[in-house]
Every structure is written in structure tokens, then in C-alpha cells.
Design a protein with these regions (language model features):
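Glycine-rich phosphate-binding loops of nucleotide-dependent enzymes
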Residues: 2-267
């Protein structure tokens, strides 16, 4: 039986370990993510953050330990099943289909809950039903349009994704992820490449997503954004957790300052 703390948390990580040859990308990671929280995961390059996301989404299988999401053991490695169960992800490098419209792109996310592969979801989002739109399709379209309004993309819904400016492409990727109706959203460096104005807008977007009832794990190098938005922060270094606490604690932790933040960090 799962422990009470595990059942009450959105996500519980227990002794999670991943090796590549003799290298420990993650070494016995322990971590709890509270439901409805913005929980940041920070650390230098090579600390294990991307490996952690790949384990959560089923891209990799752990060598030891377990992942418990909403009280259920995540022992199915298929990424499509993780999506159906309520886990979605964005990527540091934007991954869009450049020749699809903005609306079609978000529709792919909606269809990912019904189809076992992104390619089948792509076909369902792009191809028109032969005898008119089914009720389920109309509902998905309505949900996609609501998300476009939330992200301020309604006016560009018929443009190709490749025609959008960089900041709007970031918004579009977030909209597509939310279209899968996740309860846990993994954000991989969403502020990468953004200017200060776009980063401030991103701050508002992330808190808005949290206010929709979505728990968020944020991997990000912009420490001003991380410290200003996070409820809790876990710090990794060489695959090992070196600190876990509220932002004020993390800023003062000498291990974090030495390994990652540095003495002269300005927040």
C-alpha cells in the first residue's frame, strides 16, 4: 500500500535512479510535488533535469526507484499512456509542425488523449471527417479555441505555426500541451530565448495555468523567474539532490550557491 504522503501528493519520487553505463544521471532521487504547486527543478547543465523529465514521460525506464502520480505507480513506459494519465511536457527547443495552422497545432494536443501515437493524432487533427464534424470533434475544437483565447492567439489561429514570432511559438507549444488536459505539466526551460518583456508575460501565463488547477514542474535557468514564481525548489547536482525548500531557503543555501547560483547572483 502506498504511504499517506505519497497518496496526498500529486507526484512522489522514491529512490529514482538512472544510469548510462557507469554514469549516474540520477542517483536515488527523493522528491515530493504538492498538488497545485509550481515546483522548480534547478541545477547546472548535466545535473539530471532532462533525464528526470524523460523518466516522468516514459521516454526512459528507471534502473531503480519508482514514480507515483496521483497515488498510482507509473510502471507503463509508453509516453502515450503517460499523456492519457494526465502528464504533459514542453521542450527547451520548440517542437511544432511548421506547416500546420495554429488551430490545427492545438487540435493535435486534444487528439493525443484519444489516439495511441502523435501521428494518428496529427491525422485526426488535420483530416476532415467525411460526413461532418462529430460531437467529440466539435468539443475538441471548442476547447482548442478556448485555449487560443487564453494564450492570446485567437487572431492568428489560421496562420502557419512557422509564421509566428518566437514568443508566440512558445505560447502555442504551451497551448498544445494544455489541450491534452494535463494535471501535471512539465516545462523545460520555457523562458529560453525570450526577452525580459516576454519573460514577464510568461510569468503571468504560468501562474494562470496553475490557477486552472494544473500542477507544474519547472526546469529553468532564469533565476529571477524561478525565485519569483515557485512555491518550492529542488536543486540537483551530478544527479543527486543537494537541496529542497522554499525559494528564500534555496537562495541562502551554501551548497546551492557553491554548485549553481554563485556568490554574485542578482535576484
Amino acid at each position: 500500500m502506498l504511504e499517506a504522503m505519497t497518496r496526498s501528493a500529486c507526484l512522489s519520487i522514491e529512490g529514482l535512479t538512472k544510469r548510462f553505463g557507469g554514469f549516474f544521471a540520477l542517483n536515488e532521487l527523493q522528491m515530493e510535488v504538492a498538488k497545485g504547486a509550481i515546483h522548480a527543478l534547478i541545477g547546472p547543465n548535466g545535473a539530471g533535469k532532462t533525464t528526470f523529465f524523460n523518466l516522468l514521460t516514459g521516454v526512459f525506464r528507471p534502473d531503480a526507484g519508482r514514480i507515483v502520480f496521483e497515488g498510482q505507480l507509473m510502471d507503463d513506459a509508453r509516453p502515450s499512456r503517460r499523456t492519457v494519465k494526465g502528464i504533459a511536457r514542453t521542450f527547451q527547443n520548440i517542437r511544432l509542425f511548421p506547416h500546420l495552422t495554429v488551430l490545427q497545432t492545438v487540435m493535435i494536443g486534444a487528439h493525443c488523449r484519444s489516439f495511441p501515437s502523435v501521428w494518428k493524432a496529427l491525422g485526426a487533427a488535420v483530416l476532415q471527417p467525411p460526413f461532418g464534424e462529430a460531437e467529440e470533434e466539435r468539443n475538441m475544437r471548442g476547447h482548442a479555441l478556448e485555449l487560443l483565447e487564453f494564450f492570446g492567439l485567437t487572431d492568428v489561429r489560421d496562420l502557419k505555426a512557422s509564421d509566428l514570432p518566437y514568443g508566440d511559438q512558445r505560447r502555442l507549444e504551451l497551448a498544445r500541451a494544455l489541450a491534452t488536459e494535463p494535471r501535471l505539466l512539465l516545462l523545460d526551460e520555457p523562458a529560453a530565448g525570450m526577452n525580459p518583456h516576454e519573460t514577464q508575460e510568461l510569468d503571468n501565463i504560468i501562474t494562470g495555468i496553475r490557477d486552472r488547477g494544473v500542477t507544474i514542474i519547472l526546469v529553468e535557468h532564469d533565476m529571477r523567474l524561478v525565485m519569483g514564481i515557485s512555491d518550492r525548489i529542488t536543486v540537483l547536482n551530478f544527479g543527486t539532490r543537494i537541496a529542497d525548500g522554499e525559494p528564500q531557503e534555496i537562495q541562502r543555501d551554501p551548497r546551492v550557491i557553491e554548485a549553481y547560483l554563485g556568490e554574485d547572483v542578482q535576484l
